[in-house]
A protein has these predicted regions:
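Active-site beta-loop-alpha junctions enriched in small/polar residues
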Residues: 1, 39-45, 71-73, 100-104, ...
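Active-site beta->alpha loop and helix N-cap motifs at the rims of alpha/beta catalytic domains
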Residues: 1-36, 41-49, 59
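Glycine-rich tight-turn/loop motif centered on a GG-T
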Residues: 3-21, 71-83, 141-143
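Alpha/beta catalytic cores of nucleotide-metabolism and tRNA/nucleoside-modifying enzymes
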Residues: 23-26, 31-33, 47-65, 77, ...
Length: 227
């Protein structure tokens, strides 16, 4: 629903042009050798069923999986997702349907499945700052604070390597902010956001390791921030 995307007749703006969705999905499906998936919202507004129309059109054009976010385009990122609005799409689809929106832990995943009748869930922003949530959803034990810091360092390395230093440093700020918010450390967020190159970011993370471990011991045991 981002304005810069919708201005280009892309993203959720396509819900106003179901025929164009069909053409795009058909073109992609005929051009690749892997299954094609489509993600949509429930509609342009809460009063229409454009999401269901888009899902069915995408299926008929060759999509093998549909993901539906429980908000309308008009809702943008406000309010709450409405997983129950996925039932109509589920009843008309032959391919799997995944529920998306406001899924941040096991309880919200179970809620989305129960209310939507979907075949599964897809996490988006709920995984920001806690990539280990997938292990938790599968019933596995969570990594220790030390292991989480190692994962954060690996993620930082990967962003610099994949995007290059200029873009990697910029993108790392967003992800590190998500990590640090979950650890309840606003002062550390401000410090990290001021760093201007990859070397500074690496050095900062190394220098703050012990401080972050001490903070984690409090945050995770007191339940102040979602683990």
């Amino acid at each position: 629903p981002a304005k810069k995307v919708c201005r280009k007749a892309a993203g959720s703006a396509l819900l106003a042009d179901i025929d164009q969705i069909s053409r795009i999905v058909a073109a992609v499906a005929s051009a690749v050798d892997v299954p094609v998936s489509v993600k949509t919202r429930i509609g342009l507004t809460l009063d229409d069923n454009a999401g269901t129309q888009a899902a069915v059109a995408a299926q008929e054009a060759g999509a093998q999986l549909i993901v539906m976010h429980g908000r309308s385009r008009a809702c943008r990122f406000k309010g709450h997702a409405c997983p129950e609005r996925l039932h109509q799409a589920r009843s008309r689809l032959r391919v799997p349907l995944l529920a998306n929106g406001d899924i941040v832990d096991l309880a919200s995943a179970e809620h989305a499945l129960r209310r939507s009748g979907a075949d599964g869930v897809m996490l988006g922003r709920g995984a920001m700052g806690q990539p280990w949530i997938f292990a938790k959803l599968l019933g596995h034990s969570l990594p220790s604070a030390e292991d989480r810091l190692d994962l954060i360092r690996e993620h930082l390395d990967a962003m610099h390597a994949f995007y290059g230093e200029e873009a990697g440093v910029r993108i790392a700020r967003k992800h590190m902010q998500a990590y640090l918010q979950r650890w309840g450390t606003p002062e550390l967020i401000a410090d990290f956001m001021a760093l201007s190159n990859a070397q500074q970011q690496h050095a900062w993370l190394f220098a703050r390791r012990q401080q972050m471990l001490q903070r984690a011991a409090y945050v995770f045991t007191q339940g102040k921030v979602a683990a």
